[in-house]
């Protein structure tokens, strides 16, 4: 399994990986979680996909997308600020140039991959490491996101606790919470699985 960061696809292979990631989002958010999201032709997307985000993809050895997340600069339009302001205690996001938003995080939990820390899926840890690696490589120090309480517990369990920036509130069928996560080299080194590989150019002594 390796991590890729794709903004604009440079070739047919990257274009296919992006399509596969939209298909994964449809399976997870629409089919499994039952969210009211826009699915066309088996692919989930929204208006934030039109803002030239960077997609972090975890790709298996057989070129299957097994995890994904979407990253956008927090100073621009974001889901947390524009869709979920009710989750912010101040009513607005105190964004800065070193903050990036992570949204549409999901992992194909049906894959028969090994598990990492305890019962945490290896693909989940790989995605955490990939998001941090890309953020540090691009001089972001803080990641803002909206998640649910179950996933907040997973973050705490692996030693990457969410710093809440508002109280949890019901959003649809779940209880959501907004918060920030530090993007730090030592966190990356601690979370990455032993067989972690990526194509992100970073400062961690590897060619990503």
UniProtKB/Swiss-Prot annotation:
Belongs to the autoinducer synthase family. Its EC number is 2.3.1.184. Gene3D superfamilies: 3.40.630.30. It catalyses: a fatty acyl-[ACP] + S-adenosyl-L-methionine = an N-acyl-L-homoserine lactone + S-methyl-5'-thioadenosine + holo-[ACP] + H(+). GO terms for molecular function: N-acyl homoserine lactone synthase activity. SUPFAM superfamilies: Acyl-CoA N-acyltransferases (Nat). This is Probable acyl-homoserine-lactone synthase. The gene is traI. The keyword Transport does not apply. Required for the synthesis of OHHL (N-(3-oxooctanoyl)-L-homoserine lactone), an autoinducer molecule which binds to TraR and thus acts in the control of conjugal transfer. InterPro entries: Acyl_CoA_acyltransferase, Autoind_synth_CS, Autoind_synthase. Keywords: Autoinducer synthesis, Conjugation, Plasmid, Quorum sensing, S-adenosyl-L-methionine, Transferase. Transmembrane segments: none annotated. PROSITE patterns: AUTOINDUCER_SYNTH_1, AUTOINDUCER_SYNTH_2.
């Amino acid at each position: 399994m390796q991590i890729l960061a794709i903004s604009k696809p440079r070739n047919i292979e990257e274009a296919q990986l992006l399509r596969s990631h939209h298909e994964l989002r449809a399976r997870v958010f629409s089919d499994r979680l039952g969210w009211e999201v826009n699915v066309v032709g088996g692919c989930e997307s929204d208006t934030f996909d039109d803002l030239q985000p960077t997609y972090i993809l975890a790709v298996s050895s057989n070129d299957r997308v097994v995890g994904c997340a979407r990253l956008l600069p927090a100073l621009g339009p974001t889901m947390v600020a524009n869709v979920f302001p009710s989750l912010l205690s101040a009513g607005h996001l105190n964004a800065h140039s070193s903050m990036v938003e992570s949204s549409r995080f999901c992992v194909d939990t049906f894959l028969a991959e090994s598990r990492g820390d305890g019962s945490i899926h290896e693909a989940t840890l790989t995605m955490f490491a990939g998001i941090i690696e890309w953020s540090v490589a691009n001089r972001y120090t803080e990641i803002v996101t909206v998640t649910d309480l179950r996933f907040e517990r997973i973050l705490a369990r692996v030693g990457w606790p969410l710093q809440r920036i508002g109280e949890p509130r019901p959003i649809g069928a779940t209880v959501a919470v907004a918060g920030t996560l530090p993007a730090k080299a030592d966190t990356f080194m601690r979370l990455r699985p032993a067989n972690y590989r990526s194509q992100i150019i970073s400062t961690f002594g590897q060619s990503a």
